C-alpha cells in the first residue's frame, strides 16, 4: 500500500473545505489544508457575512424615516462609512481567527499559501514543497467576472466594495443577478445615488417571474434607478472624455491622461455610455456580472479531472471527479452556489470517503434568500417551471403590510404557493417581503417534507403577521 503524507489534502479554506477537513480529522484522518488568501472563503470574508452586515446598516435610513410616522422625534444624521468599515473589518478578522482555531483544534495542518494538484495524489505548495495525499478535495470557490472591454479595470467588483476608502455619491451597478440587486438596495439605503443597468428584460433571471416583477417594483420605490434592456457600451475616466478630441490620436490629445494602472475603485469619476445612448458620470462602477469557478492553474485537467466549459470541476453525485482520488465541492463545481450547500457537500464527502457510507448530495428543494430590498425567499419550483411539468394551481396575494400601511408607504408584499393539481403537494413557495429569508426557512421544511395545500390550510394562522397569508389563501388565482 502506498505511503502518503496525508489521508486528505484540502485545497481551499472556505466553509465547505474547512468543514470537510475538520470532520475528517475528528474521525482520525491525517488532514492538511491549504488556503492562499483568507480563511473563511467568499462567505465569511467577501460575501454572505459582510454583505448581510451592510444590509443591516442600510435599513436604518428607512427605519429612521418610518419612526417619525410612528410618533418618534428622530434627529437627522448621516451614515459614517469610516466607523462602520472599521468595525466590519474587525468582525471579519474575528471570524477568520475562529476558522483558523477550529482547524488547529481539530488537528488539521494548515498551509497559508497556494496549492496546486500535480497528479492523482500529488500537491505542490507555492513555496515549492511537494506533498502527497490518498485523497484530494478541491474547494477553491469562485470569483467575480469582469466584462472583457476597454476600461473594465476602472470598475470594482463585490470583492472590493467592502473596502472602499469612502462611499461614492453616485454609483452605477452593471448586472441583474442577486449580487447586483442586493448591492443596489444596500448602497441606496446608505445614501448613495444608485443607477442599475441590466441587459435582460427583467432582473433575477431564473427566479419566479411574478416575484421578479414585485422585487423590481419595490427596488424602484425605494430609490434605485433601475433600467432593464440596457448594458454598458463604453467607459473611461471622466478626465479623458472629450467628444471634440475623438478623432485625435490618444497621445496627441490636449486632455491626454496616462492609462490607469492603480487598484480598483480609485480611478476617480468615470464616464460611461449605455447601449441606449445615455452618457453619464459616476464616482464608482460596480460590475456584478456573474461569478466563475477558481480552477485556473490548479492542474486538475492534467491530473485526470474534467473541467467544464464554464471552468467548473465536473463531479458525480458523490462529488468525485473523473480522477478517482480527487473530489470537489462548493462553488468550484458550479452546482448550487450557496454556503450551506457547500457545507452539506463537505459532510457527504466525509461520509462517502472516510466513513464507508456512500452519501449522494441532495440538491433538491433547497430554500434560499436574496437580500434585496424588499427581501426575497424562495423554495421549490417557479410557476413557469411547474406549468411546464404538470397542471398546477397558483395561490397568490399581494398586499400592504400593516407596518408600512400605517406609515403611509406603498410597499407591497407577495405571498405565493404553486400547488400540484394531481398530488396537492406544494411544489414551490415564494415570498417578497421584509424578513422573507427568515420565513422561507420554515416554509422550506414543509415543502421538503412534501406538505400538501390542505396541510397548509390545517395550520392556524398567527395574527397579525405577514406570513399568516401562507395558510389563509383558499382560492387559486389561476390554474395552468
Model-derived features with residue positions:
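Beta1/beta-strand and adjacent pyrophosphate-binding region of the FAD-binding site
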Residues: 2-14, 167-177
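Flexible, glycine-rich terminal cap/loop adjacent to redox cofactors
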Residues: 11-16, 20-38, 42, 49, ...
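Glycine-rich Rossmann-fold phosphate-binding loop(s) that bind the pyrophosphate
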Residues: 12-15, 36-37, 174-177, 207, ...
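Glycine-rich dinucleotide-binding loop and its adjacent helix/turn
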Residues: 48, 140-199, 222-226, 301-303, ...
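Glycine-rich active-site loop/strand segments that organize a redox cofactor
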Residues: 52-87, 359-361
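A Rossmann-like FAD-binding core segment of flavoenzymes
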Residues: 75, 109-112, 116-124, 131, ...
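FAD-site-proximal beta/loop scaffold in flavoenzymes
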Residues: 152-168, 279-355, 457
Amino acid at each position: 500500500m502506498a505511503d502518503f503524507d496525508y489521508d486528505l489534502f484540502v485545497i481551499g479554506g472556505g466553509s465547505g473545505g474547512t468543514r470537510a477537513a475538520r470532520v475528517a480529522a475528528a474521525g482520525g484522518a491525517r488532514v492538511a489544508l491549504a488556503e492562499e488568501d483568507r480563511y473563511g472563503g467568499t462567505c465569511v470574508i467577501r460575501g454572505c457575512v459582510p454583505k448581510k452586515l451592510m444590509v443591516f446598516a442600510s435599513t436604518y435610513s428607512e427605519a429612521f424615516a418610518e419612526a417619525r410616522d410612528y410618533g418618534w422625534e428622530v434627529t437627522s444624521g448621516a451614515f459614517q462609512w469610516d466607523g462602520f468599515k472599521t468595525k466590519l473589518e474587525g468582525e471579519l478578522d474575528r471570524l477568520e481567527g475562529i476558522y483558523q482555531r477550529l482547524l488547529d483544534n481539530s488537528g488539521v495542518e494548515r498551509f497559508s499559501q497556494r496549492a496546486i494538484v500535480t497528479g492523482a495524489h500529488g500537491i505542490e505548495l507555492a513555496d515549492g514543497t511537494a506533498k502527497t495525499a490518498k485523497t484530494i478535495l478541491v474547494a477553491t470557490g469562485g470569483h467575480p467576472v469582469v466584462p472583457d472591454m476597454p476600461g473594465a479595470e476602472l470598475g470594482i467588483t463585490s470583492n472590493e466594495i467592502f473596502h472602499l476608502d469612502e462611499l461614492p455619491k453616485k454609483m452605477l451597478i452593471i448586472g441583474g443577478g442577486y449580487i447586483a440587486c442586493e448591492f443596489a438596495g444596500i448602497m441606496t439605503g446608505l445614501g448613495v445615488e444608485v443607477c442599475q443597468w441590466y441587459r435582460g428584460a427583467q432582473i433575477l433571471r431564473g427566479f419566479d417571474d411574478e416575484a421578479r416583477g414585485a422585487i423590481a417594483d419595490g427596488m424602484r420605490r425605494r430609490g434605485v434607478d433601475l433600467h432593464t434592456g440596457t448594458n454598458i457600451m463604453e467607459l473611461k475616466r471622466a478626465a479623458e472624455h472629450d467628444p471634440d478630441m475623438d478623432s485625435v490620436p490618444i497621445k496627441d490629445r490636449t486632455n491626454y491622461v496616462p492609462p490607469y494602472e492603480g487598484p480598483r475603485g480609485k480611478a476617480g469619476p468615470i464616464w460611461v455610455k449605455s447601449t441606449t445612448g445615455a452618457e453619464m458620470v459616476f464616482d464608482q462602477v460596480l460590475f456584478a456580472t456573474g461569478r466563475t469557478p477558481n480552477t485556473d492553474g490548479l492542474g486538475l485537467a492534467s491530473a485526470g479531472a474534467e473541467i467544464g466549459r464554464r471552468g467548473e470541476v465536473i463531479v458525480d453525485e458523490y462529488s468525485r471527479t473523473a480522477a478517482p482520488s480527487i473530489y470537489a465541492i462548493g462553488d468550484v463545481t458550479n452546482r448550487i452556489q450557496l454556503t450551506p450547500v457547500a457545507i452539506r457537500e463537505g459532510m457527504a464527502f466525509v461520509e462517502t470517503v472516510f466513513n464507508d457510507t456512500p452519501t449522494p448530495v441532495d440538491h433538491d428543494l433547497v430554500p434560499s434568500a436574496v437580500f434585496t430590498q424588499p427581501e426575497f425567499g424562495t423554495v421549490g419550483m417557479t410557476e413557469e417551471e411547474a406549468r411546464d411539468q404538470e397542471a398546477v394551481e397558483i395561490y397568490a396575494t399581494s398586499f400592504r403590510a400593516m407596518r408600512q400601511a400605517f406609515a403611509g408607504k406603498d410597499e407591497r408584499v407577495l405571498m405565493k404557493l404553486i400547488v400540484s393539481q394531481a398530488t396537492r403537494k406544494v411544489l414551490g413557495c415564494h415570498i417578497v417581503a421584509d424578513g422573507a429569508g427568515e420565513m422561507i426557512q420554515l416554509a422550506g421544511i414543509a415543502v421538503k417534507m412534501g406538505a400538501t395545500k390542505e396541510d397548509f390550510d390545517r395550520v392556524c394562522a398567527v395574527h397579525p403577521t405577514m406570513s399568516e397569508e401562507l395558510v389563509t389563501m383558499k382560492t387559486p388565482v389561476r390554474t395552468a
